[in-house]
């Protein structure tokens, strides 16, 4: 029998099975920390331009961004373009993942994203007045965006596939919540450096992106690939080793082999499906099209319900629509970002207890009411009404941090099928960045024309989101990714909506998932039904166990020992 060794698993450039010498919960904690680092970088980028775009030194270095009067349309367009060009880069990165993500794997994409982010930040930081400075800054923003697009499309999928069903939502919610903490850090750094009368005022905040990216890069170099992805690439031995490592169990344990067999079987249901974009939009029992549209809708409505209009331009909103002076607007913007970060704490308790569906509904309803208050107060401008408008903004960011901040990053990889999970998540993330670009580009122009009209538009979009959630979003809390496949297949067979099936279908064990899959005929249309008979998992189990039963105890080779010694040292 073949002797499994970790050295046999190493690729040409990176190891897919390295794990810092950690196992079980400690390894999962490290995976969570790496994911949080990636999304805190994303949040930092979101908050970065809020105060910089109208900062004195930034406007001096890039004169085209300086407004001359309250209705300088040219300057507001340049401000919008300088801020939103980042989203175009993010879109390009997400598009790359959608087409190539399944072939490359989760870990290499995150490493690539980190390196590209560093390159982009260096380009932007080194822009100097008189040397096509604004063009260089924008190019750096776009390059940074490409790196962020790779990371935001990949990290949620990677962490979802590395997590247990019972705490998957909590762990992915942690990474989403760190977006708010990254934004808060950016706001307060911008405020602190606003007293500086040199280019350090904007260069230091921009260069801080490098620090976040370096931390993510350092974590990821020795964190493992997703076992589900390894199985999809017929690298079952590596997957079995990693499942045992994540469970802190011997790869020969019956539970480990059974889990790998179930994953193997789930992946093989679509093994013969062609690797093309058309797979993402297939229908039938897989319902990939419906799942992709649901995933994309979470990101579409996250943007068009007003979150980044408030986050990217909070200082501008307080200054222009609520008529606070610039310095006070920056302070209130910092408080705004702090409340945003603190509001995410509540989501840790609600994400599993309340569930995804109810939390979506709570968030959309609360945001709709909040923006209704803001727009109503701004119709007739005076000092008292301005305070009411500010209250509406603070209520909005509280509801957003509690719900719709994290959910669009948790939900898409949960509802996607294994074969197109990376593509589905990338498709939803592409939707995010296109909508994000539109909102960030046109919000300053919209505000300049009609402050209250801007909030009325976002309030209406929030009200429209409520029926979309109610009629199309199934509950996924506490369910394995394979159970969710069953929900959509059963909805197709019964001619009903997935949310109805999810409400009535009890939680399933691994064997019950397989029984339902056989009963529903959840196999690829190009394959024969007999390939998925009731003994399939048992056959897979016997094959995996028989091929490798005597070998896995030898997995700890010299490389693993050295890695562990170096880490502990």
Swiss-Prot record:
Primary location class: membrane
Glycoprotein as UniProt keyword: yes
Region (Disordered): 524-569
Positions in the Cytoplasmic compartment: 1-29, 101-107, 151-168, 225-291, 352-358, 411-426, 475-569
UniProt KW keywords: Glycoprotein, Membrane, Repeat, Sugar transport, Transmembrane, Transmembrane helix, Transport
Listed Basic and acidic residues bias regions: 556-569
GO MF, one example: carbohydrate:proton symporter activity
Entry keyword annotation includes Flavoprotein: no
Gene Ontology CC terms: cell periphery; fungal-type vacuole; membrane; plasma membrane
Amino acid composition bias (Acidic residues), ranges on this chain: 524-533
Subcellular location, record wording: Membrane
Residues bearing attached sugar chains per UniProt: 197, 319
Transmembrane parts of this sequence: 30-50, 80-100, 108-128, 130-150, 169-189, 204-224, 292-312, 331-351, 359-379, 390-410, 427-447, 454-474
SUPFAM superfamilies recorded: MFS general substrate transporter
Membrane topology: Multi-pass membrane protein
Any Gene Ontology biological process: glycerol transmembrane transport
Positions on the Extracellular side per record topology: 51-79, 129, 190-203, 313-330, 380-389, 448-453
Record InterPro entries: MFS_dom, MFS_sugar_transport-like, MFS_Sugar_Transporters, MFS_trans_sf, Sugar/inositol_transpt, Sugar_transporter_CS
Assigned protein family: Belongs to the major facilitator superfamily. Sugar transporter (TC 2.A.1.1) family.
Protein name as it appears in the record: Sugar transporter STL1
Species: Saccharomyces cerevisiae (strain ATCC 204508 / S288c)
Gene designation per UniProt: STL1
């Amino acid at each position: 029998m073949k002797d499994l060794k970790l050295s046999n698993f190493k690729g040409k450039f990176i190891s897919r099975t390295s794990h810092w010498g950690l196992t079980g919960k400690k390894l999962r904690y490290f995976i969570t920390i790496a994911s949080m680092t990636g999304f805190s970088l994303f949040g930092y980028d979101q908050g970065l331009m809020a105060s910089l775009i109208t900062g004195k030194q930034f406007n001096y270095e890039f004169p085209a961004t300086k407004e001359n009067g309250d209705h300088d349309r040219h300057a507001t367009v340049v401000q919008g373009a300088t801020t939103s060009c980042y989203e175009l880069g993010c879109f390009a990165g997400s598009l790359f993942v959608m087409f190539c993500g399944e072939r490359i794997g989760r870990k290499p994409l995150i490493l690539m994203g980190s390196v590209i982010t560093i390159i982009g930040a260096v380009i932007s930081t080194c822009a100097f007045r008189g040397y096509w400075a604004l063009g260089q800054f924008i190019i750096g923003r776009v390059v940074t965006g490409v790196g962020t697009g790779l990371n935001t499309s990949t990290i949620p999928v990677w962490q979802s596939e590395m997590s247990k069903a019972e705490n998957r939502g909590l762990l992915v919610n942690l990474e989403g919540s760190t977006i708010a903490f990254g934004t808060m850090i950016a706001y307060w750094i911008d405020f602190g450096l606003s007293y500086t009368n040199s280019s350090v005022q904007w260069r230091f905040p921009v260069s801080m992106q490098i620090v976040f990216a370096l931390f993510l890069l350092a974590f990821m170099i020795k964190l493992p690939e997703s076992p589900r992805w390894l199985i999809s690439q017929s690298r079952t031995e590596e997957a079995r080793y990693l499942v045992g490592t994540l469970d802190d169990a011997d790869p020969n344990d019956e539970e480990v082999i059974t889990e790998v067999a179930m994953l193997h079987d789930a992946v093989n249901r679509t093994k013969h499906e062609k690797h093309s974009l058309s797979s993402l939009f297939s229908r039938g029992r897989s319902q990939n099209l419906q799942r992709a549209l649901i995933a994309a809708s979470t990101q579409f409505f996250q943007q068009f319900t007003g979150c980044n209009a408030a986050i990217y331009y909070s200082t501008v909103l307080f200054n222009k629509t609520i008529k606070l002076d610039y310095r006070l607007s920056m302070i209130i913007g910092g408080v705004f970002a702090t409340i945003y970060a603190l509001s995410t704490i509540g989501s840790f308790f609600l994400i599993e207890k309340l569930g995804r569906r109810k939390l979506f509904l709570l968030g959309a309803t609360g945001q709709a009411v909040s923006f209704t208050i803001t727009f109503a107060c701004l119709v007739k401008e005076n000092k008292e009404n301005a305070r009411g408008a500010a209250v509406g903004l603070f209520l909005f960011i509280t509801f957003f941090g509690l719900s719709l901040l994290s959910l669009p990053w948790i939900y898409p990889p949960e509802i996607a099928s294994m074969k197109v999970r990376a593509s589905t998540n990338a498709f939803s993330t592409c939707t995010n960045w296109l909508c994000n670009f539109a909102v960030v580009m046109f919000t300053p122009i919209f505000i300049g024309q009609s402050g209250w009209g801007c909030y009325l538009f976002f309030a209406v979009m929030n009200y429209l989101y409520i029926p979309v959630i109610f009629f199309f979003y199934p509950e996924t809390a506490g369910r394995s990714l394979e159970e969710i496949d069953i929900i959509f297949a059963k909805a197709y067979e019964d001619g009903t909506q997935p949310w109805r099936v999810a409400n009535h279908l009890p939680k399933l064990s691994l064997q019950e998932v397989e029984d339902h899959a056989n009963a529903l005929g959840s196999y690829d249309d190009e394959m024969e039904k007999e390939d998925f008979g009731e003994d399939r998992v048992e056959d897979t189990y016997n094959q995996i166990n028989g091929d490798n039963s005597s070998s896995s105890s030898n997995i700890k080779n010299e490389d693993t020992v050295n890695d562990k010694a170096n880490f502990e040292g």
